[in-house]
């Protein structure tokens, strides 16, 4: 099963398997019709009749929906009746063209069914009316989920973009400088590759306590990073702060990092607890996974997040499990150290013979002193 690199339970976007299955079904039906030995014009006649009935049914359904939307023209469509018509008959051009083509073939081919057109139209209207009244054509939950993901209608999509634009995009660019200032006054407490990043915890059950020590006694608050302030939405000097925690292993300090929960998960949890939101526990889990995946996609294309942020996604264990949040975080910190070590090892590998055979080229800087790795000195 395809999944995100963050956690095995986070799904990837849906693919084209439904279309592939439809293609297989199409091939099987064509073989079955060929095996039955019916004349091609007979098969085409009934196929056209069925397609015309489907498109006519969609047209009738759209007209019924339009009757409701016309009552909301000013509040939903800014007084434009044409926009209301387009909202109800969005694919009317395609359906209309197919309907005209079907009617042409229906009239030109012999009427083997010998059914009056008026009778079929009345029967179609009766069938569609029953479908609307009884809700027989409702979308399956998987279809609703696919539409929401494709059109970015999910709660998770809005939360992820809000979290990035309203928070991460503001604090991540200045995070290395704040860590450097902190180290100057605290004897380089934040050392190593993992210590120079913001680590964001993502419990998929959305259980976010306000005190990390409650989640795991081996996670202890140490200090706060120097504050960052910015003018936001009319608030002068809005303050952003981040906390530094030490991670204990066998009673000894095993790691130090900038750590916090993803605060939008609290929103998802609160929505699932409030009946007015109509948000079930299953919805919460699905939206939490989509939130992680969407934020991962956003950060992958955000230059300010490069090497400044790491997402730690985990599934809250069942009762009696030996899961330890501090060990999960330490595992990520150690993995980051290994990644840096492997990267430095690869860059120091002896070059091939083709490279050694080239003339050496000296790259000499005109500056007296080497520049630091920070980009804000320019």
From Swiss-Prot:
Gene (UniProt): STING1
Segments on the Lumenal side according to the record's topology features: 35-44, 107-116
Its biological purpose: Facilitator of innate immune signaling that acts as a sensor of cytosolic DNA from bacteria and viruses and promotes the production of type I interferon (IFN-alpha and IFN-beta). Innate immune response is triggered in response to non-CpG double-stranded DNA from viruses and bacteria delivered to the cytoplasm. Acts by binding cyclic dinucleotides: recognizes and binds cyclic di-GMP (c-di-GMP), a second messenger produced by bacteria, cyclic UMP-AMP (2',3'-cUAMP), and cyclic GMP-AMP (cGAMP), a messenger produced by CGAS in response to DNA virus in the cytosol.
S-palmitoyl cysteine lipid attachment residues: 88
Subunit composition and interactions: Homodimer; forms a homodimer in absence of cyclic nucleotide (c-di-GMP or cGAMP); 'Lys-63'-linked ubiquitination at Lys-150 is required for homodimerization. Homotetramer; in presence of cyclic nucleotide (c-di-GMP or cGAMP), forms tetramers and higher-order oligomers through side-by-side packing. Interacts (when phosphorylated) with IRF3; following activation and phosphorylation on the pLxIS motif by TBK1, recruits IRF3. Interacts with RIGI, MAVS and SSR2. Interacts with RNF5 and TRIM56. Interacts with TBK1; when homodimer, leading to subsequent production of IFN-beta.
TM ranges: 18-34, 45-69, 92-106, 117-134
Cross-referenced Gene3D superfamilies: 1.20.5.5200, Stimulator of interferon genes protein
Pfam families: STING_LBD, STING_TM
Protein residues bound to 2',3'-cUAMP: 167, 238, 263
Residues exposed to the Cytoplasmic side: 1-17, 70-91, 135-378
Protein name (Swiss-Prot/TrEMBL): Stimulator of interferon genes protein
Region Mediates interaction with ZDHHC1 and ZDHHC11, residue ranges: 1-190
Any one of the GO BP annotations: activation of innate immune response
Species the sequence originates in: Bos taurus (Bovine)
PTM remark: Phosphorylation by TBK1 leads to activation and production of IFN-beta. Following cyclic nucleotide (c-di-GMP or cGAMP)-binding, activation and translocation from the endoplasmic reticulum, STING1 is phosphorylated by TBK1 at Ser-365 in the pLxIS motif. The phosphorylated pLxIS motif constitutes an IRF3-binding motif, leading to recruitment of the transcription factor IRF3 to induce type-I interferons and other cytokines. Phosphorylated on tyrosine residues upon MHC-II aggregation. Dephosphorylation by PPP6C leads to inactivation and decreased production of IFN-beta.
Residue sites binding 2',3'-cGAMP per the record: 162, 167, 238, 263
